[in-house]
Amino acid sequence: LVFLPGWDEISKLRDSLNADYNVSRSASVLPLHSMVSPADQRKVFQRPPKGMRKIVLSTNIAETAVTIDDVVFVIDSGRLKEKSYDAYSAVSTLQAAWISQASAKQRRGRAGRVRPGECYRLYSTSRYNSFAEYQLPEMQRSPLEELCLQVRVLAESGAGVVDVGPGSTAGFLSRAVEPPVAQATDNAVQLLKDIGALTPEEGLTRLGRHLGELPLHPRV
């Protein structure tokens, strides 16, 4: 099981391995990514024929979301593709970044589930020690328009799910265990007002109620 940042790295390594005669005749190279069809994704869980190795090239989805129980060796690049958001420029980016120590431990734990295994990390101990203990929560590295809209929808649903009150979306989110940057919340609320989803007092408009029912970013 090889952990790589994203589809570009997976496809390049797959092509390189398949182009090597010694590898292609003795191993089946299988990518695990949302770009791969469900039928091909299921192949990573099948045992390889006798005399053949199975090489799975995956993103961090194989850390916890799926379990391939016959993995013996793990190769960890130490990288992932992570969405980040600059609250002050209101710009989102998806870029390669170093994983956290928690992710490194999860990746190591994928090896040796059915027999003794090994994990090869393609980074030094000093690099590992520089990793954050955990990845930043998604709420701290994503635009918050969808979340703020859902907060208002739940607050005005009458179901008592959340107690927000008028004009206090930022205050509600600030009580989260790991709250977002205040500027990010302010940006999100302002955008929802600008597109007519919220009133100046942060109440839901008719448009806001309709947008809250759609599985789309409000701006779309």
Each predicted region: which residue ranges?
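P-loop NTPase motor module signature
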Residues: L1-R219
